[in-house]
Amino acid sequence: MSVAELEAHEVALEAPTGGLWRDAFHRLVRNPAAILGAFLVSLFITAAVFAPLLAHGGPKTQHLILVAGGCCPGPSHAHWLGVDQLGRDVYTRILYGARFSLLIGVVSVSIGLSVGLVLGSIAGYVGGFVDSLIMRCMDVMLAIPGLLFAIGIVALLGPGLYQIMVAVGVVNIPIFARLLRGSILAQRENDFVLAARAVGVRRPVILFSHILPNAISPVIVQGTLAMATAIIDVAGLGFLGLGPQDPATPEWGTMLTDVNDYLQTAPWLAIVPGVAIVISVLGFNLIGDGLREALDPKLRGRTGRFRERSPFWFLGVGRRRALGGV
């Protein structure tokens, strides 16, 4: 190796890195799947935030339209996605439905995240009997299917917007708790934690200043994936008749169950909210997968190969081949 090559190698070694989060952000923006997910989520958030400006009236405003030989007018210039069996504009209800889906998803994930962080931190760092007690309770909650658990909670509390938030939030608690506990256990015996203990740093300071910042990455990824799951759970509860009962609260799952009798004569009434659910869930899943690849050291560098070798990356086709058959 020549002197010039040695000097260039030394300069490359001495060049400072941008830090974990900055490097992860650069990897994330180079991931086309994550970019597509961010675009879909941006559409979802835009529809939710600016629904009053983009909608054609209110969500329960009825338009009396006479249709010969049919029940519901199809898409038209005045009503882009048609109207339902009660004369309500479907486009308007989809926009307002995005608002309520986003609200329920954010609140429910926040409930599960906050409680799960507390329980997971205590279980992972304290250990012993406290760890066993908390984890056995989490195991009992995880033994019940999530949607069935949410149905039981809503049946106990009664149908409604706030009840759904609580139900979906409780379902997410054991997921975040177990995830953070495992991440803390992996970080607890690292050298920097042992060094902090050796110099007499207090245990709460070690937990909040040294362990949690390094253990939070999987929780962030799970938070985006939990948003997708929350949207599905909310739609499922609404489809079963446990969603908001107020007609002014259009929820996508409730919109699906309201048009069961019109699937043959007006199929767009079910297709439109179904597509809205698919797009929003796909967006959050793609962002979550992109964050996982950006933050997980074991997956770094795979995004580029996956993009080059798989033309159907957004559907997950060709992943195993793109990763060398692993």
In which residue ranges do the predicted regions lie?
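Cytoplasmic juxtamembrane interface segments
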Residues: 22-44, 200-221
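Hydrophobic alpha-helical transmembrane segments of membrane transport/permease proteins
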Residues: 47-86, 239-250
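Short acidic (Asp/Glu) and glycine-rich catalytic loops that position anionic groups and cofactors
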Residues: 3, 45, 236-239
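Short, strongly hydrophobic transmembrane alpha-helices
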Residues: 34-52, 117, 278
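Generic hydrophobic alpha-helical segments
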Residues: 24-25, 80, 193, 259
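Transmembrane alpha-helical segments of polytopic membrane transport and secretion proteins
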Residues: 1-39, 288-326
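Structural signature of transmembrane alpha-helix termini at the membrane-water interface
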Residues: 25, 46-57, 122, 181, ...
